[in-house]
Amino acid sequence: MNALSKVRVYELSKELGISSKDLISLLKDEFSIEVKNHMSVVEEEDALLIKEFYGESKEENTEENIEEKYGDLQEAQIKVVKKNRKNKVKKNDDENDAQEEIVIEMEDTITVKELSDRLKKTYAEVIKELMMMGVMAAVNQEIDFEAAEKLGEKFEAIVVQREVDVLEESVEQYIEEEEEEGTVKRPPVVTVMGHVDHGKTSLLDAIRKEEVAASEAGGITQHIGAYTITINGEKITFLDTPGHEAFTSMRARGAQITDIVILVVAADDGIMPQTEEAINHCKAANVPMVVAINKMDRAGANPDKVKQQLAEKGLVAEDWGGDTITVPVSAHTKEGIDTLLEMVLLTAEMQELKSNPNRKAKGTVVDAKLDKGRGPVASLIVQNGTLNSGDSIIVGTTYGRIRAMFDDKGRKINSAGPSIPAEILGLSEVPSAGDRFYVVKDEKTAREMAEKRKEKTRSEYLATSKVSLEDLYSQIKEGKIKELNIIVKADVQGTIEAIRQSLEKLSTDEVKVRVIHGGVGAITETDVILANASSAVIIGFNVRPDSNAIVSAEKENVEIKTYRVIYSAIEDIKKAMIGMLEPEYKEVIQGRAEVRMTYKISNVGTVAGCYVQSGKITRNSGVRIIRDGIVIFESELSSLKRFKDDAKEVAAGYECGIMVEKFNDIKEGDTIEAYTMETIKKHTL
């Protein structure tokens, strides 16, 4: 080998047959060689010396003995930290007499303002310290427990996390100190983040390989929000979260349950706004990153440019002398995928991820939805303990007893251990994505806890004058409105919180945008009643109002806006607030028809035998297919017939045959809604 060549710590540990952690301790204690992590390099001369030393003393320095000798260092550090935390709470009486310590109890997050007040420090002092820690937060923004704890140490205060503050006597089992001997190694939970179109989904698909191919071949893809793969006999759990800037809250939520982030950056595009946003989330949550420089098969690929941009953001690549792992990959050719996963496992090894599978389970909701046949369905990640079928659980403000449990491939299972995703049935309502869940002793306890939580979180809605987006700006200027209330309905629960935060970010000094309710499914009369009582605008994403809701909204003068894309709603509200809403087209619903029978004609497609319930269906109208209150397809009519003759229009009370352009999956019971876009006079507010 070349005299100047170097070897990485993890490669050397493989040769010696010991873990990277133990080798780092060995280097420090026996050779006084300081290395940062498993990706650091040592000189070839030193590596040969270590091999020689290890070879000579192999009998007395077996892996077990080395672990006994050096592995205890980490355990001792953990014990010291835990002991120190206990000692902070239980100081000697003499010390307490000398100085009274501040003890602050908090939940998962706390605002900078509240923490400043409880620390008895000015906002400026606290914000300055946060900036020194690399956390950028304004007075009213929330910070997590880890940041608050570090801040407490700076100001000589003790910050204690209170996991569950409702019926604490029922859940105190969850905040007991973990038994050290009860913990075992668990799989890492990984989130893939990156800018839109940088190949995040392609990379996930390449990692899943045959699992994806097998599920898609049958026409069914499990939307569980997480899945587990096995590589070299070790499991890795991936969170499948959206990659757009609007889904900030989802990624922030993911960072709370994520152990490692794979940051995808296109080699030909470099760092973009969503990439920078993802980097900031990881830094704030102190989650280690492995950077996947994707699209290396492209002609314009420039990994050095990406590394330069990463360095500008404080992430210096390990081959540039830093400690950020970068792996060139191609989701298209599969190049570098195995190396990437190996780096993930090595990073996980350095983190020493452990949990106790023998306790009652707790974890987080990844996604949830309302299934017509199965009722409320929740996808969970178990973070500690083992979740069993038949367990009684509380999830946010809902509760239930697990009737059935499925893995990420849709197979029925009886239990799920730490870091394993599972889909469960048996909850009373659809929970929110990001809700924490806990197993309790029985369903009665879970119900009581859920009811108490509902009482605590129930908001009071004040009835004021009606509001619409078109006249919002004038009402703001006249001082008639200080708050814009919005009700959000969507087809999947996982997007509700992301939509909520995106809309609430639009708040200004003159008007506060507030999402007062979010739910899954069609817009109902109940939503209209709530909107009427609280002067709210109803916004639907990929869902439609039912007939009762339409009648009630017209009667009560409640505005219902429906969208397919979140950004359209944000832009409309933005324009309304600054007086620039200029609608050019207005959607006019022409009629609705119920599908009563379907006919498949070879080489032609599916014909729907329909009965027109209201209005009329015209040949040139746009149509949307609605199934169980959710829009599943939008297109145009390719054929409209009355008996065997072509028809220009069919009125209410008559039957007709309909074919929809590029859509053959029409089913009995579907509703076909016909509409036209009418040009209206431009209106400046």
Curated annotation (Swiss-Prot):
InterPro entries: EF-G-like_DII, EFTu-like_2, IF2_II, IF2_N, P-loop_NTPase, Small_GTP-bd, T_Tr_GTP-bd_dom, TF_IF2_bacterial-like. Residues 219-223 are annotated as: G2. GO terms for molecular function: GTP binding; GTPase activity; translation initiation factor activity. Pfam families: EF-G_D2, GTP_EFTU, GTP_EFTU_D2, IF-2, IF2_N. Residues 194-201 are annotated as: G1. Residues 294-297 are annotated as: G4. Keywords: Cytoplasm, GTP-binding, Initiation factor, Nucleotide-binding, Protein biosynthesis. One of the essential components for the initiation of protein synthesis. Protects formylmethionyl-tRNA from spontaneous hydrolysis and promotes its binding to the 30S ribosomal subunits. Also involved in the hydrolysis of GTP during the formation of the 70S ribosomal complex. Belongs to the TRAFAC class translation factor GTPase superfamily. Classic translation factor GTPase family. IF-2 subfamily. This is Translation initiation factor IF-2. It comes from Clostridium tetani (strain Massachusetts / E88). The gene is infB.
